[in-house]
């Protein structure tokens, strides 16, 4: 029985190993075959054809990170909604109510962010 189960997963293992081998071999070939002749022009930072205006390590406003986190949160909400919509008939009322609670919590969180001014750019 164990041998049969392992045999069923062999194509998946083979697919993963071939994918890893292709990735590693292509990176290794590029590293070995590409010319490596660094000079001042190649090592200088490129900014739209001009010299760099500022240091590349400038500080970002925290609001950028906040907006990124909020985007990921609501993007994950959509990722949960698609499978839920597909199996809605099979999961019945319990799944429907559970998703309504989930969406309700997200709406309450969104209202809280709005009231606190997390979406304002003053």
UniProtKB/Swiss-Prot annotation:
Cellular compartments annotated: Cell inner membrane
GO molecular function, one term: NADH:ubiquinone reductase (non-electrogenic) activity
Documented EC number(s): 7.1.1.-
Main subcellular location of this protein, as a coarse class: membrane
Chain segments annotated as transmembrane: 12-32, 67-87, 91-111
UniProt keyword list: Cell inner membrane, Cell membrane, Membrane, NAD, Quinone, Translocase, Transmembrane, Transmembrane helix, Transport, Ubiquinone
Its membrane topology: Multi-pass membrane protein
Source domain of life: Bacteria
Catalytic activity: a quinone + NADH + 5 H(+)(in) = a quinol + NAD(+) + 4 H(+)(out)
Any one GO CC term of the record: NADH dehydrogenase complex
One Pfam entry name: Oxidored_q4
Root EC class: translocase
Family assignment from sequence similarity: Belongs to the complex I subunit 3 family.
Assembly and interaction partners: NDH-1 is composed of 14 different subunits. Subunits NuoA, H, J, K, L, M, N constitute the membrane sector of the complex.
Role, per record: NDH-1 shuttles electrons from NADH, via FMN and iron-sulfur (Fe-S) centers, to quinones in the respiratory chain. The immediate electron acceptor for the enzyme in this species is believed to be ubiquinone. Couples the redox reaction to proton translocation (for every two electrons transferred, four hydrogen ions are translocated across the cytoplasmic membrane), and thus conserves the redox energy in a proton gradient.
Name assigned to this protein: NADH-quinone oxidoreductase subunit A
Organism from which the protein derives: Nitrosomonas europaea (strain ATCC 19718 / CIP 103999 / KCTC 2705 / NBRC 14298)
């Amino acid at each position: 029985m164990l041998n049969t189960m392992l045999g069923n997963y062999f194509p998946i293992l083979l697919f993963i190993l071939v994918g890893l081998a292709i990735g590693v071999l292509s990176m290794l070939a590029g590293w070995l075959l590409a010319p490596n002749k660094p000079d001042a022009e190649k090592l200088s930072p490129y900014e739209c054809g001009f010299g760099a205006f500022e240091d590349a390590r400038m500080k970002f406003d925290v609001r950028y990170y906040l907006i990124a986190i909020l985007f990921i949160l609501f993007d994950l909400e959509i990722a949960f909604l698609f499978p839920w919509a597909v199996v809605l008939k099979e999961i019945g009322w319990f799944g429907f109510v559970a998703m309504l609670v989930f969406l309700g919590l997200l709406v309450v969180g969104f209202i809280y962010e709005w009231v606190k001014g997390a979406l304002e750019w003053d």
